[in-house]
């Protein structure tokens, strides 16, 4: 790989949109502010806007495509400066400083927070610094700091990486109880931000300090943590030590060609790049690429985002995949595979239950598959039966709407073509005018199928004058009958 333009160690490296940014560091024991961008695709370096504060031994992290440069060493002092670089605009801005000024630490991003753990801070007695167990958390969303549970064993010059949402703090140094050289440690301290608790994992096999660590994410290689290089007992290492979180064990990978410490390691598409550093004599501009254990053996990861495990009237097959493929296809109801390369509609599906799975094959022959999704198709409209009113005349203006629907649905009615009125069940209609009326009930089921049913009825109450006339006729008839009977009775008596 093309060497970095500016030889240096104690730098920070970060990846944004597939490009590596090498920032700051130390060269000839002087802090530098260089900011150089490396493009692995073109194997070219480009100068970018320097960091406002030249420093080394700082922590670096990426959040929301911006690079956070925090803390570090300037001369013989430790700082808490928090400067943020935006590659999209090639500009820097300053944010809230870290509460505890310190250096020789790392930054880890978990759940939108940046964790800065341990490191070294100023001491008033020789050697004028001490390791610290501070665990401070920066929230980029509101530019604020908070404190979490301290690391059990305070260290500086360690390496760290994140796997499965946990932060691994590996190796490092601590001052002895009496003046002298530093004590090197091989601990593997694990912090869980979700529980704010610490635990221990398998120790680093070969003790080292000022190495670098990074993790692969299962993109092209298995998810592993890599501890590379470092320094121990006047010896600079090129070892690659590989940690497997699945079984809490270490193994050994291919050694780095240039043994060194104070380097930076970046990961692009599960390929590692070891950049810069110090080999005991020279500040380095080395840029060495490492393809990790099992690289190229991991199948593509594909996930079906639509359909889900529910019922549909129309079905769109949509998916997410983590990298390019040579071929993709789906199998519906265990039938033959159908080739696809983008979102597609599944047409002519029968009523009822279905299953679907997607397969993806990469250029290396690795076949991946999604989970199987079970779903149902329902294209039938709800069936509505109106019991009342019926297609007839009614003498009352107070009408009860009574009906049934054969499935859960959103309900409404419309009277005489007016706007729909939402209801939840049977209801009494508003007072109606005399004459004919049209009533339609609507039902829309949970997947959008709509049905309707209409009845026609008439409001025709008996007129008041008609009733009075009938009563009068009956009264007259009764009176006439009475008089007739009375006269007949009188005639009989006279005879």
Region locations from a protein language model:
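Kelch-like beta-propeller repeat domains
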Residues: 1-297
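Generic secretory/membrane-interface signal
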Residues: 27, 75, 84, 96-98, ...
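Membrane-embedded alpha-helical segments of small multi-pass membrane proteins
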Residues: 470-474
């Amino acid at each position: 790989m093309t060497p970095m333009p500016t030889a240096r160690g104690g730098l920070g490296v970060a990846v944004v949109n597939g490009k590596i940014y090498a920032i700051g560091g130390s060269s000839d024991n002087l802090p530098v502010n260089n900011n150089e961008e490396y493009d692995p695709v073109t194997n070219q370096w480009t100068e970018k806007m320097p960091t406002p504060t030249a420093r080394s031994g700082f922590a670096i992290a990426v959040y929301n495509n911006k690079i956070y440069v925090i803390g570090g060493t300037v001369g013989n002092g430790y700082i808490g400066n928090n400067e943020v670089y935006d590659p999209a605009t090639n500009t820097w801005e300053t944010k809230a400083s870290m509460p505890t000024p310190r250096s020789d630490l790392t930054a880890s991003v978990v759940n939108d927070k940046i964790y800065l753990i341990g490191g070294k801070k100023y001491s008033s007695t020789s050697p004028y610094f001490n390791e610290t167990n501070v665990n401070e958390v920066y929230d980029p969303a509101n530019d604020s700091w908070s404190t979490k549970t301290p690391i059990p064993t305070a260290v500086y010059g360690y390496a760290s990486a994140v796997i499965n949402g946990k932060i691994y703090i590996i190796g490092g140094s601590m001052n002895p109880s009496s003046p002298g050289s530093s004590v090197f440690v091989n601990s593997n301290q694990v912090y869980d931000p979700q529980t704010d608790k610490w635990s221990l994992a398998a120790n680093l096999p070969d003790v080292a300090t000022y190495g670098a660590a990074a993790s692969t994410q299962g993109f092209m290689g298995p998810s592993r943590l890599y501890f590379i290089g470092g320094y121990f007992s006047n010896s600079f290492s090129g070892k690659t030590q590989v940690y497997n979180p699945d079984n809490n064990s270490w193994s050994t990978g291919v050694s780095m060609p240039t043994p060194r410490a104070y380097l930076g390691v970046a990961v692009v598409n599960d390929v590692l790049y070891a950049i810069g550093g110090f080999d005991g004599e020279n500040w380095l501009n080395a840029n060495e690429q490492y393809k990790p254990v099992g690289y190229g053996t991991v199948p593509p990861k594909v996930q079906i985002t639509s359909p889900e495990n529910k019922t549909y009237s129309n079905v769109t097959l949509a998916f997410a995949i983590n990298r390019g493929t040579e071929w993709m296809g789906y199998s519906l109801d265990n039938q033959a595979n159908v080739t696809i390369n983008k979102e597609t509609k599944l047409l002519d599906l029968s009523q009822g239950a279905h299953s679907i799975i997607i397969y993806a094959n990469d250029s290396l022959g690795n076949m991946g598959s999604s989970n199987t999704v079970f779903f149902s198709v329902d294209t039938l409209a709800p069936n509505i039966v109106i019991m009342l009113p019926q297609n007839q005349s009614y003498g009352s203006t107070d009408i009860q709407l009574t009906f049934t629907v054969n499935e859960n649905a959103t309900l409404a009615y419309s009277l005489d073509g007016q706007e729909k009125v939402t209801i939840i069940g049977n209801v009494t209609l508003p007072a109606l005018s005399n004459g004919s009326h049209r009533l339609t009930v609507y039902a829309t089921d949970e997947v959008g199928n709509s049905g309707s049913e209409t009845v026609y009825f008439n409001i025709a109450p008996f007129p008041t004058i008609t009733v009075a006339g009938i009563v009068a006729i009956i009264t007259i008839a009764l009176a006439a009958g009475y008089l007739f009977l009375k006269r007949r009775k009188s005639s009989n008596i006279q005879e």
